[in-house]
Amino acid sequence: MKEKVIDKFSDLSFTKDYAGKSAYVIYDNILLSIVCNEYSYGGKSGLYEIGVFSNDGRNIIVDGVTESEDFVRGWLSAKAVTHAIRRMSEITGVVGRQGGDLMFEWNTKEVLHQDSESYQKTVNFNNM
């Protein structure tokens, strides 16, 4: 798939797997994951779950995107996913992208391999 700009849900290209489907949007060193599968919040109802990750493998709480005390947000419609995509562009200051070598480049950056409690964090994008 060629690299493309992602501004709304209908721009996404999903990958199917045994449990459902997933997509990602990369904002420089931040990744927005969008999933719909039998294990995701709302997936059995055809709704989506999103999560945000830094390129070092940390889950990130993002105001207006994830839940305030959780690293994911579930039970989302396509319209709500579009809101999250646009909110991520707004707070990171970059346009989300998908495809090409983006995922390979993102995955090859150093990733922490620690238990989840030790690498979770909340990001204040105003201080970056």
Segments and roles (model prediction):
Residues K2-K8, V52-M128:
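Mixed-charge, Lys/Arg-enriched low-complexity segments
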